Design a protein with these regions (language model features):
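Amphipathic alpha-helical packing segments from all-alpha helical-bundle domains
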Residues: 103, 114-123, 127, 136-163
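Amphipathic alpha-helical segments enriched in hydrophobic/aromatic and basic residues
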Residues: 31, 38, 47-48, 58-59, ...
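Basic, helix-initiating cap at the start of DNA-binding domains
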Residues: 1-41, 45-56, 65-74
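Tryptophan-centric aromatic hotspots in well-structured domains and transmembrane helices
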Residues: 65-66, 142, 185-186
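Hydrophobic alpha-helical connector segments
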Residues: 89-122
Length: 214
């Protein structure tokens, strides 16, 4: 005679915990903890142990996903940037090409000014940038993972301007883009002056005078 199956208890009938949701919650807590700590104590004093304690997770949870605090901070900062893009709208970020190079570069630099003045970005990005000046490995990672995608967009837009006859063909776009962004970065990082739309608009006007066909 077959043995009847016991009715499931109330406890066994409960759905299993969603490990994906739990992992995402832990990951988000680690991002927040890493960004908060690098602002509060600086990059050198930020540790995996400190991040874990702040996030309420074990060290092994962090080491399961990342190999170093630099990796944690890079991913946390990239995630912060992705959040900003989602808030801005559904369209993926791209350098505008309206046919007016000056207007397009001014538009992008104004958005950069907004981001640099956003408290969510300013403190952690300043801490990472300052450490990248003295920590060559971190500096290279900052350029490769955070800056290079944006630099490539500038290069592409300047090449399009060359094709349209707006920029001299012998100009190296990789060098030319620094006319726009390097003065802004220095002023922001070293507090040598205020950053504003007027400032970046002027940078564009001056730079394009030197890049235009003669």
């Amino acid at each position: 005679m077959a043995v009847p199956k016991p009715a499931p208890s109330a406890q066994s009938a409960k759905p299993a915990p969603d490990s994906t949701r739990r992992s995402e919650k832990s990951r988000r807590a680690i991002y927040d903890a890493a960004l908060a700590l690098v602002v509060e104590v600086g990059y050198p004093k930020t540790t995996i142990e400190g991040i874990a304690a702040r996030a309420g997770v074990g060290k092994q949870t962090i080491y399961r996903w990342w190999s170093s605090k630099a990796d944690v901070l890079m991913e946390a900062f990239l995630d912060l940037g992705e959040q900003s893009l989602r808030e801005a709208g559904p369209e993926p970020y791209a350098f505008p090409d309206t046919g007016d190079l000056a207007a397009d570069v001014k538009f992008v630099l104004r958005a950069t000014v907004d981001q640099l003045r956003d408290p969510r970005f300013e403190a952690p990005s300043r801490a990472l940038a300052a450490e990248g000046v003295v920590n060559e490995q971190l500096g290279r990672e900052l350029v490769a993972k955070l800056m290079q995608p944006s630099l490539d967009l500038y290069i592409g837009r300047l090449r399009a301007a060359q094709d349209a006859g707006q920029v001299r063909p012998e100009v190296d776009p990789r060098i030319a883009l620094e006319f726009f962004i390097s003065p802004l970065a220095q002023r922001w990082l070293q507090h040598t002056g205020p950053i504003s739309y007027e400032y970046t608009d002027t940078l564009v006007d001056y730079a394009l005078q030197g890049l235009a066909p003669r």
